[in-house]
Structures are given as C-alpha cells and as structure tokens.
Amino acid sequence: MPDSWSTTTLKDLCESINGLWKGKKEPFIHVGIIRNANFTKDFKLDYSNIEYIDVEQQTFAKRHLMNGDLIVEKSGGSDNNPVGRTILYEGKSGVFSFSNFTMVLRIKHSNTILSKFLYYYILAIYQKGAMRLMQTQTTGLHNLILDKFLSMPIHIPSLSEQEQIVERIETIFTSLDMIMESL
C-alpha cells in the first residue's frame, strides 16, 4: 500500500442501514423494494422485477435509497455464491427502499471516499473469495457476519487517485463488454 493512502473500516466510512419489509402500522406508502433477486450476476441492479409493497411511511422516510448507496446482500447466498454481493444504486433518491435481506452502506463524508471506488473495492474483495470467511450458514441460509464485514480494513487513496482508478476500471469493463458482444 502506498504511503499516501490511509486505512479505515467500513463502519468508520459508512452508516449501515438495515432493510425493511411489509408495514404493520398505517399510514402506508406503496414503494419498490430492491431485493437479492434484483442483483445481477455481474453485480448490477436489475429493475425488471422490482417488488412493490406497502411499507410504513415513517419507516420509508428513514430507509429509502439515496443515489450512491451501496446495497449489500446480508442474507441469502449459496455455497457457490456467498453473501456479501454488493451493488451500487445510481438512481433517483427517495424512490426505492431495500429488503430486510439486505442493508445499505451510505458514505458518511463524500470528501473521503467515492461510492464507485468503494463499490469496486468491495467487489474485488468479494471476487477474491474473502466473503466466505465473513458468513455463517443455518438451515441453508447464509448470513453475513456484520461485525467482521464492517470491520474489514479499507485502504483509501486521495479522491483524485480514486477517480483515476474508477476511470481505469470502467474503461477495462467497457472494453470487455465490447469483446463479449462481438463473440
């Protein structure tokens, strides 16, 4: 790690917010809920099958998605696909919420880390298989060990370096997408 980078944890960088499900107390609001089923195999958000349910208006006010939020699968997964899959929400704020099988990481200080950089950072950790060490399994359901997940070290370069890293990653992914389409 370069000397100019700093090290912190997810719990210091982000607010973690648990998801919700159907409401019990009126007034209700009918909203779209992002679920594990909306995570694509390439870690994107699939809008084609969003579940719309009635949730408590007061709860939705505290648990709606904001542009730049990271949605983390905390329950579900499988032996081949551990929990911890993360997607970046790049949509309008206040439109959707997220299910009780997920949680959101919301960056506390945008002058510290870019949400896209953190998304790619967590994706790299996931792809290396490190999430397997941060899960438990009971009756076939895999659960993220939140304390381990939120305590993992995050190495942070300057914002300008983060922007350069994100740009390089996205250039590579664009090239790969073009290659895949041409096959």
Q: What role is predicted for each listed range?
A:
Residues M1-L20, S151, H155-E167, T171-L183:
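Non-catalytic DNA-recognition/assembly elements of restriction-modification systems
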Residues Y120-Q127, T171-T174:
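Short, intrinsically disordered, mixed-charge
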Residues V95-M103, M131, Q135-I156:
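A short glycine-rich beta-alpha junction/loop motif
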